[in-house]
């Protein structure tokens, strides 16, 4: 049944999507969540996906199955073993198969079959994504419910702090130290990313440092598949390491390693056994990205660019990058049929331009009900707040200069100790957290990426503060309370 209401989720889709990314990655996300929810006999049915003028919307589905809480509980408690034995090996097998695809080479019929195989693999990979993420989230709720039974809910973040561990991106510290040792730190610290990379390549010490950076960004052993968010047309860190170099710049400006400020809290004896089962599962909520999201998206992007190169070489497209303006079904058809792709590209480009000018609608279809998402998902998505107030997500009070970040180009303006104000964050932003004084996001709940990582760093954070990016002037001094969610302009 078609959803009656379609909601925006700016915490995950803050910007417009290109037609190809929307009909490959975004559609696979919706299908994967639905398939995983069925396998787990979950109390919700997932969602369908659609875009309008490039803006993404989700329509929630009712489950077509009977909810069985025992299935999801068992999946949560056995997730670490399933991850090691099944999910992680399979997702890497998918990524490696995608890397082996060469769309430029085969004749048309075989190229179409290769495209179909790519789509099968992407769908499977995002089903695996949710077979990990949903049990990981449920593990946290199992632990939280037992904690509240024993100790009450006076501190809503207390059970999650017990599950989380202090985070430190030691590789960033190592790269910053090596830049100093090789006397190239001034290039990383003082130049824009592209200019820094060019200057580093001009000297032997610089090239040596770039090789070490390359190890960190390796798609298999490193984080090369990171980007500021999941849109497939965006360059990844392996192609242009903007986020990484900005994190190293902040580390250099800070003068030395930044140890995490948070410390692990002792686990009460009554919770020790459940904690031992739930903590490793919950850890996968964040760490899975290095095995599924980063390498999988990078491999998918490279395959789709291969099809773009093929069509550009055949003269069907003016440029390889125009492939992002083709919906998946159109790209598939173009491999074996003669289509006027230039007209389609022009039409889609005009739609995106119109969407950028008009902005997103708050919803499509019927007005949303008060509780449109299942409660299990609300702590991840958040329910929105009000300007200059949100949900306290990581305890502590921070006072400092607010730096409003609307795009990746704004990262260069962030200085050590400033309070980052942004619509949302993704796991790719994690290296930046180490140098911040505080964090405010317009979206997300207390189990969102921003909230979890802020607690791991001991970084005061407020999430779900709707309108914060427009209500807080860039450069203003603010005070945030990561317990109450209060934000005060000074």
Regions found by a protein language model. Give the residues of each.
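Contiguous hydrophobic, helix-prone segments at protein termini
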Residues: 1-392
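Acidic, glycine-rich flexible loop/linker segments
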Residues: 402-409, 413-418, 423-490
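A generic structural signal for short, non-catalytic loop/turn and secondary-structure boundary residues
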Residues: 318, 395-398, 473
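Phosphate-handling DNA/RNA-contact segment within nucleic-acid enzymes
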Residues: 375-419
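Short glycine- and Lys/Arg-enriched binding-loop motifs that mark or flank ligand-binding interfaces
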Residues: 311, 386-388, 392, 396, ...
């Amino acid at each position: 049944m078609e959803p009656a209401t379609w909601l925006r989720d700016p915490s995950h889709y803050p910007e417009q999507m290109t037609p190809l990314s929307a009909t490959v990655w975004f559609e696979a996300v919706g299908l994967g969540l639905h398939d995983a929810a069925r396998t787990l006999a979950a109390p919700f049915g997932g969602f369908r996906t659609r875009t309008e003028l490039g803006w993404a919307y989700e329509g929630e589905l009712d489950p077509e199955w009977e909810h069985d809480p025992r299935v999801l509980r068992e999946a949560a408690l056995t997730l670490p073993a399933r991850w090691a034995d099944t999910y992680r090996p399979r997702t890497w097998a998918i990524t490696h198969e995608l890397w082996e695809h060469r769309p430029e080479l085969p004749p048309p019929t075989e190229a179409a079959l290769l495209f179909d195989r790519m789509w099968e693999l992407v769908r499977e990979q995002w089903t695996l994504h949710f077979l990990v993420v949903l049990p990981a989230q449920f593990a946290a709720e199992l632990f939280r419910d037992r904690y509240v039974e024993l100790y009450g809910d006076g501190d809503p973040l207390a059970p999650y702090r017990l599950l989380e561990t202090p985070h430190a991106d030691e590789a960033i510290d190592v790269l910053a130290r090596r830049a100093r040792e090789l006397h190239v730190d001034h290039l990383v610290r003082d130049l824009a990313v592209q200019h820094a990379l060019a200057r580093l390549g001009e000297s032997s010490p610089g090239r040596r440092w770039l090789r070490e950076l390359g190890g960190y960004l390796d798609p298999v052993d490193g984080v090369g598949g990171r980007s500021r968010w999941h849109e497939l047309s965006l360059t990844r860190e392996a192609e242009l390491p903007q986020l990484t170099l900005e994190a190293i710049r902040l580390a250099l400006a800070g003068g030395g390693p930044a140890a995490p400020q948070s410390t692990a809290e002792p686990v009460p004896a009554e919770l020790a056994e459940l904690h031992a089962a739930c903590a490793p599962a919950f850890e996968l909520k964040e760490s899975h990205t290095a095995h599924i999201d980063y390498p999988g998206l990078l491999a998918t992007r490279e395959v789709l660019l291969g099809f773009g190169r093929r069509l550009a070489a055949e003269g069907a497209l003016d440029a390889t990058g125009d492939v992002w303006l083709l919906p998946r079904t159109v790209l598939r058809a173009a491999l074996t049929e003669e289509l006027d792709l230039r007209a389609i590209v022009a039409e889609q480009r005009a739609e995106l331009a119109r969407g950028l000018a008009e902005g997103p609608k708050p919803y499509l279809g019927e007005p949303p009900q008060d509780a449109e998402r299942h409660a299990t998902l609300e702590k991840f998505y958040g329910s929105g707040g009000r300007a200059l107030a949100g949900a306290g997500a990581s305890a502590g009070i921070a006072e400092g200069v607010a730096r409003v970040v609307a795009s990746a180009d704004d990262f260069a303006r962030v200085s050590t100790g400033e309070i980052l104000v942004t619509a949302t964050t993704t796991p790719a932003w994690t290296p930046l957290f180490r140098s911040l004084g505080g964090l405010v996001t317009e979206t997300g709940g207390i189990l969102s990426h921003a909230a979890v990582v802020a607690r791991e760093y001991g970084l005061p954070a407020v999430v779900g503060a709707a309108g914060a990016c427009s209500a807080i002037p860039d450069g203003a001094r603010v005070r945030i309370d990561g317990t109450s969610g209060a934000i005060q302009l000074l």
